[in-house]
Curated annotation (Swiss-Prot):
Catalytic residues as annotated in Swiss-Prot or TrEMBL: 69, 128 (proton acceptor)
Name of the protein: N-acetyldiaminopimelate deacetylase
GO molecular function, one term: N-acetyldiaminopimelate deacetylase activity
Catalytic reactions of this protein: N-acetyl-(2S,6S)-2,6-diaminopimelate + H2O = (2S,6S)-2,6-diaminopimelate + acetate
Gene Ontology biological process terms in this record: diaminopimelate biosynthetic process; lysine biosynthetic process via diaminopimelate
Pfam families xrefs: M20_dimer, Peptidase_M20
Species in which this protein is naturally found: Bacillus cereus (strain AH820)
Keyword NADP: no
Alphabetic keyword roster: Amino-acid biosynthesis, Diaminopimelate biosynthesis, Hydrolase, Lysine biosynthesis
Length: 376
């Protein structure tokens, strides 16, 4: 059965997921597609493994930006797709293949029928880590094309196709990675008194960290500490000299993030004293909260509700992390959820977004951009 042009693009991209700042094939695919548009009004810049594209307007007064993240995840795919990932251990499990496809569709529409204002498309690498939004924002390549307004989307498996969901103000949480390395003294399992067991130390640390949320964060605020991975030890009869905890911190307020980190550091110091070990904390990458510009978001929601076929839902804040928050710190704009109706959620090996959402998104975003970027 034949599929539409942009569904095929999505499937092509789905087959070649690549992790942060290694998206060479994805970058080339984007460049090759843009090359087919070959228009005198299109300018292209390459930034690391990303692509920045400008469509010059007929009578520009402002620059409207669309950001699409392009990277995949280190997940082994279990969708059963005929077009499943050909890169072992990697998958587009967060919908960035759809985000990119929608961006290319919107770009195509912009070239076909130019508007008054300039349009800039940011095909951004490394959203899943270590973070591409901030360095792209600060790059020389973007400096002269910096948008005055910027928008981004993220697929939402829980919402049906034909819907978007967003809200004014805070949409996504502050997030930070968390790594704790513990080093004690190894030894024989028969002589525990001669060793400092880092498996036991790690176990105590995990349970104590949960008290940070229940006893140190305002109940009217929200915060989550998740330890997703613990490693330590070599075999069953040797007391572990080292262990490592890996997780994330998520808070709705900047103040809570600071408070949570302070309490983590105090608890880790207590573990060091209790188990006579050494501990090193590394917070890795941190993403700023996604805070939607109130007036622009309100205007967008009203436009979509009244002038397109899409249904608009006012959602609540999510503990999701997104480095698009850095762009919204400097550029007025907004992000929204796009319904894709999948049984399985984001970062799941069986995530299967409904491809019907692609064409719907391209159509209504083209309507919005033409309305926003044309002199009345």
């Amino acid at each position: 059965m034949a599929v539409s042009k942009f569904v095929q693009i999505r499937r092509d991209l789905h087959k070649i997921p690549e992790i942060g700042f290694k998206e060479w094939k994805t970058q080339q695919y984007i460049l090759d597609y843009i090359g087919t548009l070959s228009n005198e009004h299109v300018e292209v810049k390459v930034w690391r493994t990303g692509v920045i594209v400008k469509v010059k307007g007929k009578n520009p007064e402002k620059v409207i930006g669309y950001r699409a993240d392009i990277d995949g995840l280190p997940i082994t795919e279990e969708t059963g797709y005929e077009f499943a990932s050909v890169h072992e251990g990697m998958m587009h499990a967060c919908g960035h293949d759809l985000h990119t496809t929608i961006g290319l569709g919107l770009l195509t529409a912009a070239v076909t029928e130019r508007i008054d204002d300039d349009l800039v498309f940011l095909f951004q690498p490394a959203e899943e880590g270590p973070g591409g939004a901030l360095p792209m924002l600060e790059s020389e390549e973007l400096k002269e094309w910096k948008p005055n307004i910027i928008l981004g989307l993220h697929i939402a498996p829980e919402y049906p196709v034909g819907t978007i969901a967003t809200k004014e103000g805070l949409l996504f949480a502050n997030t930070s990675e968390l790594y704790v390395d513990l080093k004690g003294k190894g030894g024989h399992a028969a002589y525990p008194h001669t060793a400092n067991d880092m498996i036991v130390a790690a176990s105590h640390l995990v349970t104590q960290l949960q008290s940070v949320i229940s006893r140190n964060v305002n109940p009217l605020d929200s915060a989550v500490i998740t330890i997703g991975k613990i490693t330590g030890g070599t075999v069953q009869n040797i007391i572990a000299e080292k262990s490592r905890l890996e997780g994330t911190i998520r808070t709705l307020s900047v103040e809570s993030m600071s408070r949570v980190k302070s309490r983590i550091e105090a608890i880790v110091a207590g573990i060091e004293a209790s188990f006579q070990c050494e501990a090193v904390i590394d917070y890795g990458a941190m993403y700023h909260q996604v805070y939607n510009h109130e007036a622009l978001t309100r205007e967008f929601m009203q436009f979509v509700s009244e002038q397109t076929d899409m249904k608009v839902i006012t959602c609540t804040e999510a503990m999701t992390g997104e480095d698009f928050g850095y762009m919204l710190q400097e550029i007025p704009g907004f992000m929204f959820w796009l319904g894709v109706n999948s049984e399985y959620g984001l970062h799941h090996a069986k995530l299967k977004p409904d491809e019907e959402a692609i064409e719907k998104a391209i159509v209504f975003l083209d309507q919005y951009v033409k309305w926003k970027g044309t002199r009345k």
